[in-house]
Amino acid sequence: MKKVLLVVMSLLMITPTMQAKDKEEEYKVVVVKNEANGSYAYEQVVNVEGVSKEEMFSRAKKWIISNFKTNDNNIQFDETNLTIANTATVVLKVASGFNWALTSGLVNFKLNLQFKDGRYKFVFDNIAVQAAYSDGIVETVNYEQVQRNNKPAKHIRKEINEKLLAIATQMEEVIKTGGGKGKDDW
């Protein structure tokens, strides 16, 4: 009887630990599938009170130049239509788990901004991922192809959503308040 009780108690103690490991980390999913064309994007319209569309464009232009400027000058600013288009890259955090390790990763995406009085719209689309694993495999895939239900794919999806949300949040702060000017104050 004591042995049976001991086995039952040990199983009860192990169960919460096993359930906690199966639980996926919570994060806000911002990259969603467009049902009309099947592609994935992060799109949002942000209301801005008391700032003209020209001023929003100017603030966004300065922020993009200071954060996404590259040697190939791939940023397109259209001052007549008040639009900005850019391709940008962010780096994924390395991670590992049982039987897998992401040794490096990059996410490329296209950023489009449009400005109107009282609001602006941004779209992050054409999301592509390049991931290198510890076994030597390097894969380049679109976000649509990162929908596998394994640990590396879950990590990559989480990283992409968190990084794009952080970019959108920082950009919103700069466009609304004109912040970010203290960056050169070293």
Regions found by a protein language model. Give the residues of each.
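Bacterial Sec-dependent N-terminal signal peptides
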Residues: 1-22
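Ser/Thr-rich, low-complexity intrinsically disordered terminal regions
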Residues: 20-186
